[in-house]
Amino acid sequence: MKALIILGLVLLSVTVQGKIFERCELARTLKKLGLDGYKGVSLANWVCLAKWESGYNTDATNYNPGDESTDYGIFQINSRYWCNNGKTPGAVNACHISCNALLQNNIADAVACAKRVVSDPQGIRAWVAWKKHCQNRDVSQYVEGCGV
């Protein structure tokens, strides 16, 4: 009985955790959701961005004490400008979405919000990790062997 309870707790903890995509799985998913070439940004750049922002983890969060905002999900979308977490002072919520929706294993909402972010004048440069790790680099390795 004790072993059954422990097993149940382990399974419960597994179901609560976010999904960590495999590189090619993410590339195929992003392509299916229309990110390949969206606003001139290649699929390889999107996969590179997700690698360095979240490690392909849908459940990633990062609190920013300076402005009391939090970054959410696979693309680390910020609560100051793009989503509503009910905590960030002066939040804009330009994606008209709950920040928790960006933590789902189904990344359709995160992709829709990323499309909104990249549509702003800053484009993909809105993501610091992209500028640091992907910009002006050969990012083809991020989709290599994925058949996309």
Curated annotation (Swiss-Prot):
UniProt enzyme class: hydrolase
Reactions catalysed according to its record: Hydrolysis of (1->4)-beta-linkages between N-acetylmuramic acid and N-acetyl-D-glucosamine residues in a peptidoglycan and between N-acetyl-D-glucosamine residues in chitodextrins
Positions of the C-type lysozyme domain: 19-148
Residues at the catalytic site: E53, D71
Keyword Disulfide bond: yes
Gene Ontology molecular-function annotations: lysozyme activity
Signal peptide: 1-18
Keywords: Antimicrobial, Bacteriolytic enzyme, Disulfide bond, Glycosidase, Hydrolase, Signal
Enzyme Commission number(s) from the entry: 3.2.1.17
A Pfam family reported for this protein in Swiss-Prot or TrEMBL: Lys
Disulfide bond positions: C24-C146, C48-C134, C83-C99, C95-C113
One annotated GO biological process: killing of cells of another organism
Family: Belongs to the glycosyl hydrolase 22 family.
Subunit structure and binding partners: Monomer.
Additional facts recorded: Lysozyme C is capable of both hydrolysis and transglycosylation; it also shows a slight esterase activity. It acts rapidly on both peptide-substituted and unsubstituted peptidoglycan, and slowly on chitin oligosaccharides.
Protein function: Lysozymes have primarily a bacteriolytic function; those in tissues and body fluids are associated with the monocyte-macrophage system and enhance the activity of immunoagents.
Name under which the protein is recorded: Lysozyme C
